Amino acid sequence: KAWFVLSMRAVGGLFVDLWTSVAKTVKGWL
């Protein structure tokens, strides 16, 4: 099940990158 953990980490990293970019955009608007 190592592939499952790795895939979850990859998805988590993508969400973190997406969230940080969204936060930067929102800060730019405010």
Curated annotation (Swiss-Prot):
Does the UniProt entry include the keyword Protease? yes
A molecular function (GO) term = metallocarboxypeptidase activity
Among the GO biological process terms of this entry, one is: proteolysis
Q: Name the Enzyme Commission number(s) assigned to this protein.
A: 3.4.17.6
EC top class named in words: hydrolase
Give the UniProt keywords, A-Z: Carboxypeptidase, Hydrolase, Protease
Q: Where along the sequence do coiled-coil regions lie?
A: none
Q: Which domain of life is it from?
A: Bacteria
- Which reaction is catalysed here? Release of a C-terminal alanine from a peptide or a variety of pteroyl or acyl groups
- Recorded protein name is Alanine carboxypeptidase
